[in-house]
């Protein structure tokens, strides 16, 4: 927050200032400090835009995202997201003030030179949103499984950093080990993904363990058992 405030302080008071953040950070699974950021926006006359690719369907009322989770939807100027993750489709969206969206439609190069979503992708995304609203038990189940997974990994000595979401980083901090153990885990029935440089600094290489609403505690038990043995073999955990 200190670094952000320093930048805001040197901006011209009347200049337009837009703070662009992730709602949920895709590597470590932690959340943006949205309340503090919104306070700075009020203080310095800035606007805020959230890329909520990993918040939609998981956080907030009816899975409506990070801003809703913090009760700050009215404080956020633009919310951008994708329907390729929790919605299982293709495409994306941006929500905000009508005049701002009209401006984006006519000036955003990436939008101007892209094609519309196909009818099938649109229907799939629409149905997924209906399910999020009508079947909250799916999200409740996801969170039960997520909290259980946090507990299991920590009890077995894994470093899962500061995750606050179903994205669970398993810190490895070694590229060769990360790539090797991913292959070994796959052979033993556990699908995980490596995150290596340049996506993260070399010292922060990790394995991303991501949960879905269709996973349950028995899946977590199986995965933790397999990964604990492999991580011990590679000397990552004691």
Regions found by a protein language model. Name each.
Residues 1, 13, 17-21, 60, ...:
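Pyridoxal 5′-phosphate
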Residues 1-3, 23-28, 55-58, 111-112, ...:
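Short, small-residue-enriched loops and turns at beta-alpha junctions
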Residues 1-50:
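Active-site phosphate-binding strand-loop segment of PLP-dependent enzymes
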Residues 43-44, 156, 188, 234:
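Helix C-cap/helix->beta junction micro-motif
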Residues 44-47, 54, 59-164:
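Active-site C-terminal subdomain of aminotransferase-like
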Residues 140-149, 154-189, 199-204, 211-213:
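Conserved PLP-binding catalytic core of the aspartate aminotransferase-like
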Residues 187-190, 199-238:
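PLP-dependent enzyme catalytic core of the Aspartate aminotransferase-like
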